Amino acid sequence: MAKVRVYELAKEFGVESKVVMAKLQELGEFVRSASSTIEAPVVRKLTDAFQQGGGNGRSAGRPAAPKKAAPRPSAPSPAQAGPSQAAPAAGDRAAAPRPSAAPKAPAAQQPAAPSAPAPAPSQGPRPTPGPKPAPRPAPAAPEFTAPPAAPAAPSTPAPAPSGPKPGGARPGAPKPGGARPSGPGQDRGQQGGQGRPGGQRPGAPAQRPGGRPGGPRPGNNPFTSGGNAGMARPSAPRPQGGPRPGGPGGAPGGGPRPQGPGGQGGGPRPQAPGGNRPSPGSMPRPQGGGAGPRPGGGPRPNPGMMPQRPAAGPRPGPGGGGRGPGGAGRPGGGGGRPGGGGFAGRPGGGGGGRPGGGGGFAGRPGGGGGFGGGGGRPGFGGRPGGPGGRGGTQGAFGRPGGPARRGRKSKRQRRQEYEAMQAPSVGGVMLPRGNGETIRLSRGASLTDFAEKINANPASLVAVMMNLGEMVTATQSVSDETLHLLAGEMNYTVQIVSPEEEDRELLESFDLEFGEDEGSEEDLVVRPPVVTVMGHVDHGKTRLLDAIRKTNVIAGEAGGITQHIGAYQVATEVNDEERKITFIDTPGHEAFTAMRARGARSTDIAILVVAANDGVMPQTVEALNHAKAAEVPIVVAVNKIDVEGADPTKVRGQLTEYGLVAEEYGGDTMFVDISAKQGLHIDSLLEAVVLTADASLDLRANPVQDAQGISIESRLDRGRGAVATVLVQRGTLRVGDTMVVGDAYGRVRAMLDDNGNNVAEAGPSTPVQVLGLTNVPGAGDNFIVVEEDRTARQIAEKRAARERNAAFAKRTRRVSLEDLDKVLKAGEVQQLNLIIKGDASGSVEALESSLLQLDVGEEVDIRVLHRGVGAVTESDIDLAMGSDAIVIGFNVRAAGRAAQMAEREGVDVRYYSVIYQAIEEIEAALKGMLKPEYEEVELGTAEIREVFRSSKLGNIAGVLIRSGEVKRNTKARLLRDGKVIAENLNIEGLRRFKDDVTEIREGFEGGINLGNFNDIKVDDVIATYEMREKPRV
């Protein structure tokens, strides 16, 4: 049985918790607080102590005269029935007689069910209840018929019979109709376990047949005292001490209950054998006509009030003396107990289930049996122990009635348990098991994202990663390798969604599609070819475009090299027909690999410029590979044929090795020898471009759809804001359109062509500069025109969040527990923090990638804190101050206040206009941050010829310098027979004759003092050396 707590016992005894704790200490039992639990033997001992004391507990019930009616209490009194107190019997439903008409005779004689043998009564003093609410004034006692003679208990002061009940006390709960009065006239027996005076019921056998063997006996409750073995509670005497009503079907010695006007008897309810019933006023009861409200109440039910289940008996016959008119039971309800009608069952409800009796507290309509019968309304019905059985506690304590036995598990429960048993466990953490399913995750996803896909707890995944040697948090972006490792442990397959595919899914969620021409074949019109000029640096790409456009762009480029992507549209005559060609100029420096790749992806034809005097160079091969990867046709322009040493034939032979075979050699690649500086053969090159486009490409687009294209370059203009150079690939872009470019969006405020002229619209294959974006987009980002600004904003924000996660996952280094020592020693690793600002996004990207590729050793590292397009601002200086960063301005300068702030705070701001100068200086700074490396340089050796002992200085070695020289305050080691005897010694004293000297050269003699080291012998060798800094490579 469950242990009870101190405050529960205090509530049962009707005293404060500190009184119970004090009594426990008197008994030698120590408890910590009122919430402490105590064992059953201690409960019995405590109950006996309160019974003997009498003052603190509830006194034994005694007859009381009727008192004047008192106001009805609003709540059940806490001093009512409990499981182990000697309060009035919980089963007694006695109440003051109500004013009623003359009693009616019961409709029929109810044959009584056989009763179970009552246990031996045990008498003893029991505590009396606390002050009870005064009952209503009792009316004149009705006339009763004399019952058959029965022997009365010798020590029973009240005439009300009270038989011991087989079960324990039943819990009481306030009934909805109000509490019934508890006062004089309620005690039906003073001592617990005392038999009824009426003896055996009429018509009932002496012993109940078929009692359940092995059932709990009344005296088995460990929370009752030894003197209360019968479990019967004392009851208050009935009003005016009158005899118990009896009649046909009633209890022995009592007549029928007087009936009220409403058809309900006003007399006290009869007591049935089988245990105590809830205390008066503790069980709620729907208020009916003629039944007055009952004052008083009881404590809330607790586990100590659980009744025992007695032996089952036969179901009582229907139609006993109920509370209905004429004593008959209600329709469908069982009869009352013999000796007085109980509360009969409601319509549709089963009868009461007390042993040998009819309706107890009956179930609601449609419910099961009453209190102790079949499962009735929750809170009333007991355990469905069958008719005549004492129910469990499910109904009594607000739980739905149901079988006590363990229900059969459903298939779903069994399957879940089986899957839990089969789930993988890593380090004691249970994980869901996959069946090889493919989980799609974006790059830079966190463990929380992964857990949502597989319905797992993110904290479990963090614990598993710790067991696998990886330290990550639940919301931290993790690398692809980490996700694959974790998924493999749970039998899942992780598919990292590429940025292109993720972007396509994002657009599809807004019913947008990029890269497809809308409409039918009739809507497609011919568009100009897009040609990208590629090649090695200084091979003449920009000069060629100048010659075609008849301009001088190269004069404006710093250092004479192109560091931006330029897009131009040129109208030329080919075969007496004017044709437009769009040219894209890409940088040739090795730092602009990504820029060249973007140019190749957005083009139709690639012109590979190769200098005739240099031949094929590294960036030539790289540009060639980009063009092949983009699957675009290539036209080779052999430039600088007019310079000394030019050999176009050599160039053709070199390119043959890379799969470009000239037409004159039987291939399909067109080679054109030109001189951009002199303007030679430019027309032939343009003709070759047009012929290649017409022969191998279908250049058509739909000009009436919403514009789509690619951002070639972008920058932050001081007067215009964000300016993006875009190439329209399909559709027509107009001023006023809402467009989203990467993570930037906005409404097109103005458009400029390559000559700086305002244009109202741009068709397919037209490069324009767009003004009106919220921020500077990245080079190579796709743009698309949408209908609403809200859609553009949502797409841009989601793209920005995705890029942040991917960048964080890229920057985050995997830290394993094995490498934790190295990480904790991170102070030894020097970091060069950089803030990069440039004039164009492509240049900033190229500079960042080139700097991050610098590798000068593991002791130093580069960390780019921030990169952006535009001038150096005060916020950049603030960031540099907080992180000791160097600000790099690439083709931009610091604004007025930002420059003053940088000078005042000592922030290092460096300006560059050529990319390779920036790379060289940053590399030199990294090498300067390296810790110096030292190497050992041998100075000389000295042979000990004599050992001189000095009380002041110790042993002094008289030596002959064999090689090199010996200097004072240098390091030395002592060798004996070729073995090192001592390391890291210091030459503390050096003398030649009696003079202190700083060095002794080869062939001279002298004296050497090695400080505190005195273990020197003749013929030992002293080798001296010094540590010199080694230059870093």
Curated annotation (Swiss-Prot):
PANTHER family in UniProt: TR-TYPE G DOMAIN-CONTAINING PROTEIN (PTHR43381:SF5), TRANSLATION INITIATION FACTOR IF-2-RELATED (PTHR43381)
Record-level Gene Ontology MF annotations: GTP binding; GTPase activity; translation initiation factor activity
Pfam families (alphabetical): EF-G_D2 (PF22042), GTP_EFTU (PF00009), IF-2 (PF11987), IF2_N (PF04760)
Subcellular compartments: Cytoplasm
Entry similarity comment: Belongs to the TRAFAC class translation factor GTPase superfamily. Classic translation factor GTPase family. IF-2 subfamily.
Compositionally biased tracts (Gly residues): 190-201, 247-268, 318-401
Entry GO CC: cytoplasm; cytosol
Region (G2): 560-564
Compositional bias segments (type: Basic residues): 405-414
Domain of life, source organism: Bacteria
Name used for this protein in its record: Translation initiation factor IF-2
Ranges where the record places region Disordered: 49-432
Species: Streptomyces coelicolor (strain ATCC BAA-471 / A3(2) / M145)
